[in-house]
Amino acid sequence: MVFGPGLLSVQFMNIISTTGKQRARQLLFIMGALLIATHEVCPSLAEERREKIGLVLAGGGALGMAHVGVLKVLEENRVPIAYVAGTSMGSIIGAAFATGQRVDAMEQLLIESNWDEIFSDSVNRDELSYRSKAGRNREIYGDTKISVKNGKLITPFGVVQGQRLLPVLQRLYENGPPSPADFNEFRIPLRVVAADIETGQAVVVSKGDVATAVRASMSVPGVFAPVEIDGRLLVDGGITNNLPMDVVREMGADRLIVVELNADLQKRDSLSSPLAIGGQIISILLAQNSAIQKKTLTKEDILIEPNLTGYTAVDFGKAKELIALGEEAARRLIPQLKHLSVSEAEYAKFKAAREATIKQTTVEFVTIHCDKHGSKEFLDKVVTTKPGDILDRNALDEEVERIYNTGDY
């Protein structure tokens, strides 16, 4: 039985004209009817009124591994996240969370990965042809100019192209929808922040291939080659908006959980590689623009700042320690986080939906583009993946690695 507002008003008017036990009985009846009406008309009222919590993950190179520790604490305390935005390393972790990667799987990947190899474009010289070896020698001993050829940016030796990084990112996001995708359709809506190297403007990526978007967001100028998306040449978003609080608010968040990363600057004797110098530049720039964003914090927002003293943006080999520091910082704020907790049943539903395994992906087509330096016959032989096959990412990665190691592609 459902009582509308008009009927309830009539019943209350009738109470005025009654007395004694009759009034009491009628009042109890109307109160019960009101409870039934509320339950039947608005069965999910509590859920609808729940605040939408946005998660903001700052950039900071290796320091961003601390984000995983924060995610562990958010899960333990049943804090449902409605929106995610990240910059640079924050976008790597944020995209993994938004596309359904398990937090423990993220932790394992970060700890077990060989980051020196991932950040290297070196190839196995034993597999190079004589011509490719000669070309590699010319790259090493000369030709350090930046130029444009056939409309593409040609970068000098020493700039990481990210050949080995992209497969790692794709594996992190394999539980998400096929690319290209609308990032609003992810398990948790996502935004990836990069910067346009030509204009200096922040670029918020909300669609396309998520691995490519993240690869752009972490392209430290002078270290990683820029990434072209929609005609714009994109680099690390940390130079324009390292703490994208404004982006998450625009997505619809009522309150924010903000994870800031404060990096120690390195001394001169430690600045001995392009990666170290690039990390130093980003650390300086991100500190400046993060301060601007933090001025917009409200009393409803929660700011988590891991104590990262002694660690730098290039400490990728210290994943375990950095994750622990993020976890420690979040645990200090559990009293505040508890206010955002939902019931065990509700969080279990949220977690199950976020981590739901996607169906197997079927290959629809395979297209191979070969320039004048490559061999179409060789590529046809190496690439065994065919239309109609169930995608085997391990096999595909091996095929790509073999092709890359020839030095011709």
Task: Enumerate the predicted regions with their spans.
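Bacterial N-terminal signal peptides that target proteins for export
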Residues: 8-28
